[in-house]
């Protein structure tokens, strides 16, 4: 599954937060950098005004007051750099964060795989013009468009270094107007290239839904216009956002943080806000003044989960950021999660229903999807840990049989396909348990034990169990020095 089902008609409940002007003088006197979970501060010349800390090394927050003895208001507690058995990948070799790869290594990935890049609108438009101009001769001869598009949906491999599924370079598929079987798809591709080029030239963005309705007779339905957009991203090696294509964003983020924008304003996330379309307009992510340390990011499968946790004030009581894609996440939601992970260094935990679709959604955040294979490198978060809910979690609760439904044939096929991947032992075991249990459920069934039970008891316990996974591996990997203990 992927994000191709984005629909502009979908409107989840929106929590609008206020914009406020952040005083530049307050920002200059209060911004400091923190290393690790302790209160150690760094005020060296390398942490000058407006300069971001090195990615993956520092976390940062707000302090009240000024001078040499600031009071900590709260900061981001970075993830322990140890393997956790609840991640999706097998083996204890940690993935190298994409943003920490040296430039020559990134180039090596681009040579070996089809990976889309961020480009300026001017560069993107020039690339599209070259594609159109390259077809002028064939069009004049009456042959129409012809494009050789990289194969990405069925030409993927799992890269062990970054723990992400990527599309291998070297294979292409033809879209030719001369071929009767390819004529329609070639026409859709050529039309969409021209549409995007004109939109970029006008300095505008266009939604995926609008692309469909600019020529409904040509596309027919959303899946075909989405395919044309994805093909163009692969053909040009340009990311969708750089082409001015936006989807109806349904993702929401909640937490005692605010997003500092490049225009000097900020957006509070304390009561929930829709995920911004343009990450390039976010300058920083900061802890709200007066808030405690933020300890982790919790990704939840669906809108009802987020509404429930928001009602229980879970993000404040448990010092976390909550994010949902309201089902299968869009590219923007996945990119925003990667952005939060990169900027904060926080561990990421995933919560889903005990059903095949929930597992597939978490796997998409971690590894990516086939339809976005050209962008998986940029937006995947392989370190996400599957907190629950699993079949064994539900069995232990002794819920009534009326809370379950049988797995369908499609459910079993999805589980078997997931199981065949090279997954960690925990993921494999949980999938096997679900197949054996032959039932699925929804987290709402747990409310029969009390409305607040899940938020105040079960979920914190499950997260603590996953967090202990780091410690267990650490003790296993680093036994105590016997000579030192004798001293």
Swiss-Prot record:
GO terms for biological process: DNA topological change; double-strand break repair; meiotic DNA double-strand break formation; meiotic DNA double-strand break processing; reciprocal meiotic recombination. Gene3D superfamilies: 3.40.1360.10, Winged helix-like DNA-binding domain superfamily/Winged helix DNA-binding domain (1.10.10.10). PROSITE patterns: TOPO_IIB (PS52041). It is found in: Nucleus. GO terms for cellular component: nuclear chromosome. Mg(2+) binds at residues 301, 353. Residues 1-56 are annotated as: Disordered. SUPFAM superfamilies: DNA topoisomerase IV, alpha subunit. GO terms for molecular function: ATP binding; DNA binding; DNA topoisomerase type II (double strand cut, ATP-hydrolyzing) activity; hydrolase activity; metal ion binding; protein homodimerization activity; Tat protein binding. Its EC number is 5.6.2.2. It is an enzyme of class 5 (isomerase). It catalyses: ATP-dependent breakage, passage and rejoining of double-stranded DNA. Keywords: DNA-binding, Hydrolase, Isomerase, Magnesium, Metal-binding, Nucleus, Topoisomerase. The active site is at 213 (o-(5'-phospho-dna)-tyrosine intermediate). Its cofactor is Mg(2+). CDD domains: TOPRIM_TopoIIB_SPO. The keyword Mitochondrion does not apply. It comes from the Eukaryota. It holds the Pfam family TP6A_N. Plants silencing TPO6A1 are sterile due to defect in male meiosis. Homodimer. Interacts with TOP6B. Belongs to the TOP6A family. Required for meiotic recombination. Mediates DNA cleavage that forms the double-strand breaks (DSB) that initiate meiotic recombination. Possesses double-stranded DNA cleavage activity in vitro. This is Meiotic recombination protein SPO11-4. It comes from Oryza sativa subsp. japonica (Rice).
